[in-house]
């Protein structure tokens, strides 16, 4: 039997595994393009330091990639175990991009990862660079297809409900592929991943510079990360704004929740910078507002209003009543004897209200027999169409605030790199090191807003979350949740241990004999050339 507790614990399990997985994904997306840049410099200049940079940062990339794949594979099985009705209902549509991702993108990136690590002595410089570029394309193609699937959940286009099969069926693959929400989500997410990768390299390079070790290696890494990070965070912010506009078109409820906008304001709407939200009374006790900004972000105009939560609830209530009729008509169509011709009048009536079927299914949470749903139940279902406002409001602002802090960091880092004086600014290096967790936190906040703000839907406007779960015992879900948390925590600890281990060793982990910590080689070189160990290190790196 489906219960509220079963739905909540199933949601929690998927949320936990997804958030764990997304600790690894953005670093993979970002670091792979930094490897392309570094190896391109090696091919163009022939300087060994660029090859060493590619190999060292590639070692950290490889650790992260392996654990990211491990956490990602197990997520897919949850669709069959915990979300069986979801899989049956939308599998024809949702499964297509995931299948393409596995057959095309994942195999490409996995093959190229192997060639990247084991091909240094077997491939020419140009061939190995091509492998690295294909590896980068593979990781980004993988993200593209997964985000096309997720974008369809947010804005389900190119598919229709078939009452004869009781499932969604794809009608226009191009519409699914070029779904504006999916495309905006893709470019915004990968840009955020690039920012994560740049921050990672910037922070570790800053640590080397603070320790005054591997200086020439760290200087180059810092400069590459500063330039790449500045472009990435600018792209993330601009594309995040575009994603906000897309939300305003397809998910007005989410937009209103993000802004704690209870009433429809005259256009152009103001942006609530901060607010004291009173969820119980459905109002803001006070708010600090910036005039016009929300209207420009949400509508790209000064004369189009943004609907407030109260008006959205009025619209949703009408759709629930329409959906109730759709559910009853669907029951009539399903009750027809097998092989008989459906009543054309019933079919025509159903087609008129089919678009609101999902809203009618919301009532099943409160009344298994939708025909017996009372006005009080309809009101409950209407209230449930609005996600909790407080976590949405503050998570979005945390994401944006961290984004602008990163913009400030990369702007100053890039300017100092151009001037060549960032080594003389220990405050900047310490700041870069302290900001290491920031892009991960921003990315996790962003995913929380995207997924939590879609509630109460798995497929927005079509399939309620309550209606999507498997009919399994709560004890089974608790057991698998505990297993996943334990397993993923161990993987995270392994990742952190290996990352810290090799980051502390630095490029000396390559065993080239040229870097800090390889004392035998430095003493030998310095004595033979009559140089200090530090001078010998710099000369060999360059």
PLM features: what roles do these ranges have?
Residues 1-19, 46-53, 77-99, 151-187, ...:
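Membrane-interface interhelical loops and short amphipathic "cap" helices
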Residues 2-44, 52-56, 64-68:
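N-terminal signal-anchor module of multipass membrane proteins
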Residues 45-63, 89-95, 99, 119-137, ...:
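Membrane-interfacial loop-to-helix junctions in multi-pass inner-membrane proteins
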Residues 62-71, 133-153, 229-240, 351, ...:
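Hydrophobic alpha-helical membrane-insertion segments
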Residues 64-134, 151, 452-456:
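Membrane-interface helix-loop-helix modules in multi-pass inner-membrane proteins
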Residues 113-122, 127-133, 144-153, 177-255, ...:
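Internal alpha-helical transmembrane segments
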Residues 149, 231-334, 338:
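Aromatic-rich transmembrane-lumenal/periplasmic boundary elements in polytopic membrane proteins
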Residues 384-447, 478-502, 541:
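C-terminal substrate/ligand-recognition segments
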């Amino acid at each position: 039997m489906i219960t509220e507790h079963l739905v909540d614990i199933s949601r929690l399990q998927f949320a936990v595994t997804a958030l764990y997985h997304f600790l690894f994904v953005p670093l993979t997306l970002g670091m792979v393009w930094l490897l392309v840049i570094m190896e391109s410099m090696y091919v163009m200049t022939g300087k060994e330091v660029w090859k060493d940079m590619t190999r060292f940062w590639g070692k950290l990339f490889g650790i992260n990639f392996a654990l990211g794949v491990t956490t990602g594979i197990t997520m897919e099985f949850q669709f069959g175990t915990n979300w069986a009705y979801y899989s049956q209902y939308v599998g024809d549509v949702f499964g297509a991009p995931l299948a393409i991702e596995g057959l095309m993108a994942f195999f490409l990136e996995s093959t190229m990862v192997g060639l990247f690590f084991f091909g240094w002595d077997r491939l020419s410089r140009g061939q190995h660079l091509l492998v690295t570029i294909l590896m980068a394309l593979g990781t980004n193609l993988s993200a593209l297809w997964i985000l096309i699937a997720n974008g369809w959940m947010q804005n389900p286009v190119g598919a229709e409900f078939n009452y004869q099969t009781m499932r969604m069926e794809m009608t226009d693959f191009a519409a699914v592929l070029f779904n504006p929400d999916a495309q905006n989500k893709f470019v915004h997410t990968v840009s955020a991943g690039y920012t994560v990768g740049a921050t990672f390299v910037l922070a570790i390079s800053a640590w080397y510079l603070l320790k005054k070790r591997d200086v020439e290696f760290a200087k180059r890494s810092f400069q590459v990360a500063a330039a790449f990070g500045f472009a990435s965070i600018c792209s993330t912010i601009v594309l995040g704004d575009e994603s906000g506009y897309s939300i305003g078109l397809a998910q007005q409820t989410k937009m209103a929740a993000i802004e704690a906008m209870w009433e429809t304001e005259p256009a152009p709407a103001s942006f609530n910078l901060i607010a004291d939200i009173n969820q119980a009374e459905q109002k803001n006790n006070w708010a600090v507002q910036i005039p016009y900004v929300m209207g420009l972000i949400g509508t790209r105009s000064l004369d189009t209003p943004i609907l407030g939560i109260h008006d959205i609830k009025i619209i949703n209530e009408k759709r629930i009543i329409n959906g109730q009729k759709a559910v009853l008509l669907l029951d009539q169509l399903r009750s027809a004897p097998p092989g008989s011709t459906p009543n054309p009048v019933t079919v025509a009536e159903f087609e008129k209200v089919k678009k609101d079927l999902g809203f009618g299914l919301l009532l099943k949470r409160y009344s298994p027999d939708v025909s017996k749903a009372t006005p009080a139940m309809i009101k409950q279902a209407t209230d449930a169409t609005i996600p909790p406002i407080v976590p949405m409001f503050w998570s979005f602002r945390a994401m944006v605030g961290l984004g602008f802090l990163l913009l400030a960091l990369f702007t100053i880092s890039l300017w100092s790199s151009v001037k060549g004086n960032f080594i003389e600014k220990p405050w900047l290096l310490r700041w870069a090191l302290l900001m290491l967790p920031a892009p991960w936190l921003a990315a996790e906040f962003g995913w929380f807003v995207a997924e939590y703000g879609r509630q109460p839907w798995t497929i927005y406007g079509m399939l309620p979350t309550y209606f999507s779960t498997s009919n399994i015992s709560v004890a089974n879900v608790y057991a698998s949740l505990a297993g996943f948390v334990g397993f993923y925590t161990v993987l995270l600890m392994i990742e952190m241990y290996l990352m810290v281990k090799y980051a502390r060793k630095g490029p000396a982990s390559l065993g080239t004999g040229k870097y800090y910590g390889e004392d035998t080689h430095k003493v030998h070189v310095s004595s033979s050339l009559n140089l200090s160990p530090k001078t010998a290190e710099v000369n060999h790196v360059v």
